[in-house]
């Protein structure tokens, strides 16, 4: 079977191979040394809370398994809106919320909806490897901007300003970040957004690890900066539901 040129551009997701190798190593030494702590994949060691499991059982028993609204179940979107208000103090109307089959699907859909062929999207390097492929699938170009430990491996407003060009469409950020685990300082995130807004660009931010930070200053959603922020969140990490999609 001949694959598309688009598919040929996608690199393997190497972290899964690393995870398999680590699991094999853990099995080999099981019982002979201290248990291993896995730092290679973004997945909790425990499953979803009992209330979530019970809700899934009820849905199956009650026959709630048919097509839903394309934007997601309306009661679910309302509850997500309430959760943002309660947890983060942010007003996000349900009409702004779209439910997808996972955060990767949301990132891909956002890129397809907002990026045209030839558009450039700025993102830090290192960053989540799939992000550049989401942009590429939309016929855009990911512009990787090197970052350092001193910069928390995150972009700054100054770097965004310096890298912005005629073809730049916007930025794709992650806070907290995968794979580095670092967050963007609130003042810096605000400054980045101001630069992007002044350029007429878009700000997409991956917030699927939001709420898992031990530092209060990094526990706020970027959605508080304005209704032109596109935030991607997920049940996978905070609610321990990686395989539930």
Question: Which residues does each predicted region cover?
Answer:
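Conserved PLP-anchoring active-site segment centered on the Schiff-base-forming lysine
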Residues: 113-135
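Conserved coil-to-alpha-helix start sites within the AMP-binding
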Residues: 103-107, 127-131, 239
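Short, intrinsically disordered, charge-balanced linker/junction segments flanking boundaries
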Residues: 243-245
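Short beta->alpha connector loops at strand-helix junctions that form conserved
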Residues: 125, 144-148
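Short acidic capping loops at alpha-helix termini that bridge into adjacent secondary structure
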Residues: 91-97, 117-120, 167, 227-228
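Flexible low-complexity scaffold tracts in large eukaryotic assembly proteins
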Residues: 39, 175-178
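Active-site pre-lysine segment of PLP-dependent enzymes
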Residues: 18, 136, 143, 154-170, ...
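N-terminal small-domain helix-loop-helix segment of the aminotransferase-like
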Residues: 8-102, 109
């Amino acid at each position: 079977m001949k694959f598309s040129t688009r598919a040929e551009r996608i690199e393997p997701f190497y972290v899964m191979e690393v995870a398999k190798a680590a699991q094999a190593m853990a099995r080999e030494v099981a019982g002979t040394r201290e248990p291993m702590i896995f730092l290679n994949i973004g997945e909790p060691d425990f499953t979803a809370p009992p209330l979530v499991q019970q809700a899934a059982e009820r849905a199956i028993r009650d026959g709630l398994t048919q097509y839903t609204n394309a934007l997601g179940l309306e009661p679910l979107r309302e509850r997500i809106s309430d959760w943002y208000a309660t947890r983060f103090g942010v007003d996000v109307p349900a009409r702004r919320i779209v439910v997808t089959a996972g955060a990767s699907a949301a990132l891909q859909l956002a890129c397809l909806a907002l990026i045209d062929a030839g558009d450039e999207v700025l993102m830090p390097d290192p960053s989540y490897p799939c992000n550049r492929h989401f942009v590429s699938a939309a016929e855009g170009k990911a512009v990787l901007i090197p970052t350092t430990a001193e910069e928390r491996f995150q972009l700054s407003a100054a770097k965004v300003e310096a890298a912005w060009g005629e073809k730049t469409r916007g930025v794709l950020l992650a806070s907290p970040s995968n794979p580095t685990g670092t967050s963007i300082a609130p003042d810096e995130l605000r400054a980045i957004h101001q630069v992007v807004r002044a350029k007429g660009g878009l700000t997409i931010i991956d917030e699927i690890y939001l709420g898992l930070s031990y530092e209060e200053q990094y526990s706020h959603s970027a959605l508080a900066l304005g209704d032109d922020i596109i935030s991607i969140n997920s049940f996978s990490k905070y609610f321990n539901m990686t395989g539930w999609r």
